[in-house]
């Protein structure tokens, strides 16, 4: 009976560790999805303003650049194909 209790405790600890790892991965992916939605909204806002006024919004581009942690980024201009 003693070994069965030890086995149950070990199984519970392993299950807890697996649950923590899985929920950590889920949380990281959720944050990525939220960040991508924010980037998509900024891109849409930049393109709408560019269509309306003939030029792009510098503030939105700076915010988008800060989100993707790169320099000037224009994802709609793809010349690397």
Curated annotation (Swiss-Prot):
Residues 1-7 are extracellular. GO terms for biological process: receptor catabolic process; symbiont-mediated suppression of host innate immune response; symbiont-mediated suppression of host type I interferon-mediated signaling pathway; symbiont-mediated-mediated suppression of host tetherin activity; viral release from host cell. Residues 29-81 are cytoplasmic. SUPFAM superfamilies: HIV-1 VPU cytoplasmic domain. The chain crosses the membrane at residues 8-28. It comes from the Viruses. One of its GO terms (molecular function) is monoatomic cation channel activity. Residues 53-63 have a biased composition (Acidic residues). Phosphorylated by host CK2. This phosphorylation is necessary for interaction with human BTRC and degradation of CD4. The modification Phosphoserine is found at residues 53, 57. Residues 50-81 are annotated as: Disordered. Enhances virion budding by targeting host CD4 and Tetherin/BST2 to proteasome degradation. Degradation of CD4 prevents any unwanted premature interactions between viral Env and its host receptor CD4 in the endoplasmic reticulum. Degradation of antiretroviral protein Tetherin/BST2 is important for virion budding, as BST2 tethers new viral particles to the host cell membrane. Mechanistically, Vpu bridges either CD4 or BST2 to BTRC, a substrate recognition subunit of the Skp1/Cullin/F-box protein E3 ubiquitin ligase, induces their ubiquitination and subsequent proteasomal degradation. Homopentamer. Interacts with host CD4 and BRTC; these interactions induce proteasomal degradation of CD4. Interacts with host BST2; this interaction leads to the degradation of host BST2. Interacts with host FBXW11. Interacts with host AP1M1; this interaction plays a role in the mistrafficking and subsequent degradation of host BST2. Interacts with host RANBP2; this interaction allows Vpu to down-regulate host BLM sumoylation. The N-terminus and transmembrane domains are required for self-oligomerization and proper virion budding, whereas the cytoplasmic domain is required for CD4 degradation. The cytoplasmic domain is composed of 2 amphipathic alpha helix that form a U-shape. HIV-1 lineages are divided in three main groups, M (for Major), O (for Outlier), and N (for New, or Non-M, Non-O). The vast majority of strains found worldwide belong to the group M. Group O seems to be endemic to and largely confined to Cameroon and neighboring countries in West Central Africa, where these viruses represent a small minority of HIV-1 strains. The group N is represented by a limited number of isolates from Cameroonian persons. The group M is further subdivided in 9 clades or subtypes (A to D, F to H, J and K). Belongs to the HIV-1 VPU protein family. This is Protein Vpu.
């Amino acid at each position: 009976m003693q070994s069965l209790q030890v086995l149950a405790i070990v199984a519970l600890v392993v299950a807890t560790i697996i649950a923590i790892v899985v929920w950590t991965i889920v949380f990281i992916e959720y944050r990525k999805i939220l960040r991508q939605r924010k980037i998509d909204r900024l891109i849409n806002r930049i393109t709408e303003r560019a269509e309306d006024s003939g030029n792009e919004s510098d503030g939105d581009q700076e915010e988008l650049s800060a989100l993707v942690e790169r320099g000037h980024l224009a994802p709609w201009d793809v010349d690397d194909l």
